[in-house]
């Protein structure tokens, strides 16, 4: 949810990066975790990856300083909850979620309950304790010439 607020297609950052021509619609984000680690990844095509990195850092710093707009939080929470409900229309997605839930020791509907309990204050605290510039890295893949 936090990443969607920061860089989702309806976010101020996404709009700003598109308007400046720094990204195209391939821009994305993901969060992954494993035993004793977690990471956030922003990716996509850009002619100026350093400028994109700076804009992302600026947006994160702004959210840390000013907090999360409550209307944006509410809209994002409803959007993601709705996306989860829509996933129940896809038998493949249901099967995948059942397997993932089983291995996590949860049932398939746990995420629905978790989404209801997330608050803006929780996300603000999470943001303050993560995404530090000192732990970030920019990796650029250039075409072979």
Residue ranges and their predicted role:
Residues 22-24, 37-39, 133-136:
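Active-site lining segments that contact anionic ligands and/or coordinate catalytic metals
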Residues 20-28, 121-124:
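Short amphipathic beta-strand starts and helix->beta connectors
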């Amino acid at each position: 949810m936090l990443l969607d607020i920061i860089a989702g297609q309806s976010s101020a950052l996404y709009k700003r990066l598109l308007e400046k021509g720094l990204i195209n619609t391939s821009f994305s984000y993901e969060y992954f975790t494993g035993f004793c680690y977690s990471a956030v990844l922003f990716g996509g095509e850009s002619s100026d990856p350093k400028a994109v990195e700076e804009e992302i850092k600026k947006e994160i710093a702004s959210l840390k300083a000013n907090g999360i707009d409550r209307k944006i939080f509410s809209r994002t929470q409803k959007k993601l909850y709705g996306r989860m409900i829509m996933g129940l229309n896809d038998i493949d997605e249901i099967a995948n979620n059942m397997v993932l839930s089983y291995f996590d020791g949860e049932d398939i509907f746990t995420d629905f309950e978790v989404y209801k309990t997330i608050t803006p204050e929780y996300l603000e605290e999470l943001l303050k304790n993560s995404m530090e510039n000192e732990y970030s890295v920019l990796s650029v893949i250039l075409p072979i010439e």
